[in-house]
Amino acid sequence: NKGLRFMSVLKRRSNNIKDGQYVIAFSDSRALIDISKDCGMTWTRRQPSDLPNVNEYFFSNDRTRIAMSGDGRHIYCSCYMANVGLLRSTDFLETAEPFKPDNCYSVYSIACNGRGNLVAIVCQNSNNKYDLMLSGDYGKTWTKITDSSFSARTLAVSYDGKYMVIEGGYSYSGARISADYGKTWALKHSVIGNSFALGLSSDGKYAIAQE
């Protein structure tokens, strides 16, 4: 698929659901989304008109990012387009609800834990800085975590949500780690900077950064 830009795959067994059973793929050239519920063997194609009140940029923007719970039920999509915000679904995108936290101009990246209740996003604020914001109730309420001394860009969350890693881009080099569900943070690697993507193992023991 030449236009494929982002894919999300379920990575955990839960309630008799197979590892990798649910797969979601977005295209950057067409306003389409492809969904598989059988490990990619068959696919169902959706378009913006299938989801009322959903901005088509969620389907056709190269900055679209996806986070999915371990059972495939909870799905969060972010779009970097200004004032577009987030998309939330509790039924594997059969239906979806757009929403946006306060003082969040655009969403740069997103991650969630295995249950899908703990959601982390990086938002560009009105001062053109990037804030890390956390929700512990499936995206209903949000708490700003970072301050003016650090601007988050990319992030990753462990399966249980206990461990998180964030990286701050060119001006705020270094990876910061939390081992208490985002309550406190420590600088663990001062060299890493401007990572395109971060990865964290399910137990939080291993992390990888692509620069």
Model-found features: residue ranges?
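Asp-box/BNR beta-propeller loop motif
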Residues: 1, 34-45, 88-98, 133-144, ...
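Surface loop/turn motifs at the tips and blade-to-blade linkers of beta-strand repeat domains
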Residues: 1, 48-50, 57, 100-103, ...
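Repeated scaffold domains used in trafficking and secretory/extracellular systems
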Residues: 2-15, 57-68, 105-112, 150-157, ...
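Conserved Ser/Thr-centered positions that define the repeating blades of beta-propeller domains
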Residues: 17, 36-37, 69, 89-90, ...
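Residue-level marker for isolated small/hydroxyl-bearing positions within beta-strands
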Residues: 25-27, 78, 121-122, 167, ...
